[in-house]
Amino acid sequence: MIAKLQGFPENVIAFAGRGQVTKDDYVSTLIPAVERAFASYDRLRFYYELGGDFAGIDVDAMAEDFKIGMQHLTRWERFAVVTDVKWIAHAISLFSFVMPGAIKVFSTKDADQARSWIVSPSL
């Protein structure tokens, strides 16, 4: 499942992946929130937390993630991904060259640092 996280500025979309993340989670929760935010802001930041209760993500959910990312490719300002899942960290580093915004992966023990970074002013 995907849960929307509170306590972030309006230009930061923040979610946590818990348990098994599915395509339905993206279609019913994440994508509508992203579209609503882009209706109000030209550029957004994205914070995604995949902690100890994250069990995995199905292939269809990954496809939805890729589609929403590419649909708004030039409008993403910054990404923070918090995870200790090595394959996710590696996948992000492989695809980071495609993304125009800054991308950082943080370990779960550094979640506070990730939250500070995602809201910090751009240089």
Descriptions of predicted regions:
Residues 1-123:
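Amphipathic, Lys/Arg-enriched alpha-helical "gate/interface" segment within cytosolic domains
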